[in-house]
Structure formats: structure tokens, C-alpha cells
Amino acid sequence: MTNVMDVLRERGFIDAVTSEEIRQLTNQPIKVYCGFDPTADSLHLGNLVAIMGLAWFQRFGHTPVAIVGGATGMIGDPSGKNAERQLLDEKKIQLNLKGISKNLEAILDFNHPTAPAIILNNLDWFKNFTFISFLRDVGKLFRLSPMLAKDSVKTRLNSEEGMSFTEFCYQILQGYDFLHLFENYGVTVELGGSDQWGNITAGTDLIRKVHAKPAYGITFPLLTKSDGQKFGKSEKGAVWLSPDKLSSYEFYQHLIRVEDADVINLMRMLTFLDMGEIRHYEQMMKEADYVPRTAQKRLAEEITRLVHGEEGLKIAIKVTEGVAPGSQTSLNADILEKLAADMPSCEMKLENVLNKKLIDLLVETKLQTSKSEARRLLRNGGVYINNKKIEDENHIISVECLISSRLILLAAGKKNKMIIRLMEE
């Protein structure tokens, strides 16, 4: 395939387009942008769809432009939200922008020979507006009827929460972003999630009104699981892309646990794997001799390498193999100390751990929520100390449980593990 739109359609990226002319447009190099709001100091797994969309365009020779919303982030996008977001101050937003930029730099190529990626902050062009000048120069270009007709606006206006004037103006800011990029950078296409359709068309309509020229929008489906829930969240919260917020091991583990019903779709949308290989895994999963989690392992390897790099993937695999319950891998304190930076760990006083019941330790480390749950897991053979199965409900922590007198690797089932650092007075 020589056209990026064909690839995106085959992989399930396209939810809607403002015009089918986009395919013809992409036969020549263009500039395409997507915006990222700085609501946190890291993007999460759900945002990876947008980054991959930009990355696919770049692979076909188009220039990806990432907008980090230093201005729009202060307003808060109402799209898909039931209530108004808490507004962030400028200092917090600047901190978040740095983290998000690192996420983008890990995946997009900023040294591409013909189409290097660009990161821009929309505060750079909004900060020079006064309220009066913005109303005069930008506000007059928008009409209330189409603004009120946007689904994101109608939903909020009909809710008990209502909608503030601040949020109502968000689509004006995003629409002006597109106009500014069109005029100053030659950007002609905007990417966004399906919940961004109204904001994207605000921009395409504005460009047509001001310049009588076409601009285009593409929306992709929001990343969801087969049960309809948003993908990118775990029991502990968002699956962050930044290693400072989530280790490569925990990131890898989240992907290994993906349900069979979701893995092929995630391969299509979150990896650069060839479609032939993806179809091979899809067929393999239907075979009677399929080894469970084979496809998930391939998925986890690809996405972890993409987000955390080759070294991050090596660490994730090493930790996974080293702390697997029942693993024959020899554990020593030095190895565990290194692993502790990439998996859940805690510190406890040695005197408070020795001679403690294992059931109590499971609860104190929050690997189990109650003693009754801990007992049940022990009876079912799901508790391990230093990779060795423990089935005695009355097991007491002794010096024999310690690695080099200072560490314990405790596991509750295959998913939940904890390295306990033992501190002497």
C-alpha cells in the first residue's frame, strides 16, 4: 500500500472523515496535527492511538505536528465529560507539558530526513491576545447556532451540571489552533478521537470561512475493550507512558493480561506489526494447540519496546522471568534491589516482619484486602515467598524467608507481587 489512508482504514483507525478527498490529498506530502491536553505530566495508553496515527503519517512521508495545549489546557475540553474539569494553574501545566513532550519524542521521529516531527505549544499564539482583541478578531468568526449544535455542548447543556462559558469557548480555541497552523505551518489535516468531531469541524469550517480553502479532519475510534470499557486504565489507575510514573515492567504486565478478545485489535492499532503477521496470530488463536498468551506476549513486547525502548523491554522481560511464581531463577539481594525500581516495593522494619504471620503480612502490604482473602489464596496455592509456594495458613515469617537478611519477594497470585525491603533500627 502506498497511501497512508489505506493503511489506517485496514488497521481500524478511521472512525470518520470530513471528506473522502483526504485520500487524494495524501498522495503528496502534507502536514497533519493532533492536540494533546496537559491534564497530567504523562500521556497514557489510551493516548497512544493518536500518537500512532501521527507516526503512520510520518512513515508515509508526511510531517506530524503535535500541539500541547498550554492555552486550551487552562480551559478544559468538555468533549465526552459529564462535569467541568478542575482548572490547572500555569506552573502545573508547564510541568505537564515537559512530560508529554518526552512521551512524543519517544515515538515520533524528530530527526526524520524529510518530515521531522514538530511540537508546538498553543499558548505561544494565544498569550498575545487580549480579551477584547480575541472577541473582535476571533469571536466574530463563529456563529452561536452551529456551536450550540455540537453534541458535546448539547449533552452538557441538558445535564444537571450544565456548562460554563469557559468550556463553551473551548471549541473556539481549538478551531483557531487549526486556522493558525494552516496559515503559519501549512497544516491541512487534523486528527482526533471520535469525541473531537465537533472541535475539529469548528476548525475546518473556520478555515473555509476565512480563506475559502479546504481543510480536513479525521477521527479515530476511542480505544475500548470488548466489554465497552475504556482501554488504558488499570485497577490502579491510568497506564502511564512515562517510566517515572509506571515502570516498564508494570506497563508490560498490563499488556500481557489483555483479554483474548482485545489483543488483535490492539495489535492493529498500537503496533507497526505487518497485517500478515497480525492475521497469523488471529488464526493461531483459533487453533486447538494454541499456547495461551502467545499473542499477548508479542503485543506486550512490541508496545513496550515502542514506548520504553529496547532497554526498557529487556528490563521488563528480565523482571517478569525473575519474579514469576515458581520460577527456578536464582534470586539474590543485588538482583532484587535492581528489580525493585521496576516493580512494586515497600520498606518495613525487620523487627516488625520477623515472627509475623504470613496472612498478616499479605494484608499489611496490601497484596490482599483481608485476612479471609489471604487464607483463601493460601489454601488455593496462590501465595509465594521468593518464588516458593506456601500453603500453610499458619506460616510464620522467619529468617529463612529472607534473602541476604534484608529482602523478601512476596507474591499473591501471578499478577500481584511485592519486594519488601527490611530495615534495621
UniProtKB/Swiss-Prot annotation:
The keyword NAD does not apply. One of its GO terms (cellular component) is cytosol. ATP binds at K233. It comes from the Bacteria. One of its GO terms (molecular function) is RNA binding. Its EC number is 6.1.1.1. It is an enzyme of class 6 (ligase). Its main location: cytoplasm. GO terms for biological process: tyrosyl-tRNA aminoacylation. PANTHER family: TYROSINE--TRNA LIGASE, MITOCHONDRIAL (PTHR11766:SF0), TYROSYL-TRNA SYNTHETASE (PTHR11766). Catalyzes the attachment of tyrosine to tRNA(Tyr) in a two-step reaction: tyrosine is first activated by ATP to form Tyr-AMP and then transferred to the acceptor end of tRNA(Tyr). Homodimer. This is Tyrosine--tRNA ligase. It comes from Protochlamydia amoebophila (strain UWE25).
